[in-house]
Amino acid sequence: MKGYKNYGTHLREKYNGQRVFKVIVDGGFTCPNRDGSKGFGGCTYCNVDSFTPEPSRKMPTIREQLEEGIKRARTSYKADKFIVYFQPNTNTYAPTHYLKMMYDEALSINTEDIVGFSVGTRPDCIDAEKVALLESYADRFDVDLEMGMESIYDETLEQINRGCSHGEFVAAVKLLENSKLDLCVHTIFGFPWETKEMMHGYIHEINRFPQIKFVKFHHLHIVEGSIMGAKYKKEPFKLFTLEEYTDLLCELIPMLRPDIVIQRLFGISDWDLLIAPNWGLNKSAIQTYIDKALEKREVVQGSLYLD
């Protein structure tokens, strides 16, 4: 038995042992720090090109994406039920009436097997009207809002061209007090100018907000097509080894509030995009390595949590 609340177990328990799989939908959204409203280039760690369809390539419709994704998940993973996951870019960065049209289309497909709805966004692209829209689906689906915190330090957010402050993150989280939505928070550990003690601060901040039900932990990795990637090629900087990152997780997980479900422990990138760190293992092997280390060290989520 794992010493932390992992997402796979959470889904099996919630849906009576059925295999539940997230199906990613690209709604063609952009980001305010990419389109000029708050800046250009996007977050410096982000592969902008991967979100920019070639002019000659027609993006599949939402229906086509979902039907293909569900078919693939049934065949490859024996999935029974599905969560519609609007993931790439900022999926609330549009007028509410347009968002409703997009969401309605996605949630009208294969409705008997859709159990959840997940929307990825930024703190500065959510407001009360959009929260109300997402809540309107909560009587039919389990709805979660996935929001990028990335770092709690404004100097870091400025360096990575995030285009929003930690104060905006806190304000967005407070919008979800007493909400029907579950909040998932995304963090990145390993910015080279942040100390381990600073990263501990992420956990203390997450613990403050009872509306945070899920977390995704990522280590910083450098990919082709990113601003940070170009800088790294010119002048490499320190990144986590697998052993160092595992050590950090062994420190952080005991500090994490015990009711929070960990959806992800590390980031992953396509091999053809990854510049560094190359740990030489696939996703499954990394997960196994980390889980074995956590078990060996008898790490228990919440054992060092201070209410």
What label would you give each PLM region?
Residues 21-25, 82-84, 117-119, 143-147, ...:
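Hydrophobic faces of well-ordered beta-strands that scaffold small-molecule active sites
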Residues 2-12, 16-21, 221-307:
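Auxiliary Fe-S-binding modules of radical SAM enzymes
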